[in-house]
Amino acid sequence: MNFDRMRALLLEQAVQGKLVPQLEDEPAVEQIGEAPNVVPLLIPKTWKWVRLNNLTTIVRGGSPRPIQAFLTDREDGLNWVKIGDAERGSMHISQCAEKIIPAGLKKTRFIRKGSLLLTNSMSFGYPYILDVDGCIHDGWLAFSDFEEFSTKEYLYYVLLSPYCRGAFVEKAAGAVVKNLNIDKVKQVYVPIPPLAEQHQIVGKLEEYFAEIDRAEKAFRELQTLAGVLKKKILQEAVMGKLVPQLDGEPAVEQLGETPEIIPFEIPQKWKWLTFNEVLSFENGDRGTNYPAKSTLTKDSSSGQPFISAVNLQNLHISNDNLLYLSKEQQRKLRSGHVKAGDCLFCIRGSLGKFAFADKDGGAIASSLVILRPKPCNCIMQKYLSYVLLSPYFTAYMNDRRNGTAQPN
């Protein structure tokens, strides 16, 4: 469920005058400065398109350098407002991680609590309201002197809207490092309704956003609960507690030695077997015949799939980013040829990811190993997948990671 998209749709409606009814007795907004030659969006008759430079005073922050020489933890230090202090999706910046000494004030810009800010570098084009006094660096723009024509909250939501986001992205286009030049921001037009209508729009947005926030929280909690239940069900399944045992079913034959210490109790007819007793393991050919990536192609008509960890998605082999090797390249490979029903298991990087091949053809990259059921037919494919997904096996794998940057 895309909650961010819901918020964006509401903002789209808001800046086009479609979120709340227009007030019939409200006079039209006075045209401030020149109207745009081409209007970006259709808006109600009582609204006006106003260039930000005519609506508000915009200033850029400043940075004392080197900043390390100005940082302090003294009580008389001034809050140093960084983009990292802003939480994406939050309207407010309520605290700052660092402070600077008062001497740095000459080389920065001091902003009062309640100021409206906009990021103009790094993650540019995101507005925030500052809840503390502080100094802003040159990655921030500050807005002021707009109260005669716009409420702070309405202007915040306009700057947050998909319309303004698109305008900012367009203004930043072409640069190697995507930054918002202050002069370009000043040229952006924004839709301004009558003040009374602005209050209504803000109130309705806050009402809807609060409902979305509650729904999103409930959805996340439900996802967490579903994950917990899934793990519990899988664990009960591999312990023989999920379904009743069949009285007429013979016991599983013990293949190999019984473990000295069993991980947990299982039904009497079950047996503890190693994977090696029920599965064959086959690595890919990692010798001189291993194909270089530069020799592979994205053209599916040229040969056979060369399957790597990135192609294992949701227990299936995804065609996204799938590369192909020629039939001659596959013919030279001494091992790692995929057959229908094979379990392709990741042993490097994304350790423990797996998927099942639904047809013959292709070969595996060095990050994978093939798990292939032995002729004893002791384990079903679906049951194997549940074992591999179970908390027991996940813990087993985690205990045996080698601790390197790339687990294997």
Question: Could you tell me what each predicted segment is?
Answer:
Residues 38, 138-140, 185-187, 261, ...:
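Short, solvent-exposed beta-strand edge segments and adjacent coil->beta transition regions
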Residues 38, 53-70, 84-113, 136, ...:
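Sequence-specific dsDNA recognition surfaces
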Residues 22-27, 65-72, 170-172, 244-250, ...:
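Short coil/turn segments at secondary-structure boundaries
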Residues 47, 155, 184-220, 270, ...:
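Amphipathic alpha-helical segments
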Residues 9, 37-63, 187, 191, ...:
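Non-catalytic DNA-recognition/assembly elements of restriction-modification systems
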Residues 1-25, 29-32, 209-255:
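Short amphipathic coiled-coil heptad-repeat segments
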Residues 82-84, 94-160, 181, 308-309, ...:
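A short beta-sheet element
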Residues 141, 158-190, 387-408:
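Specificity-determining recognition surfaces
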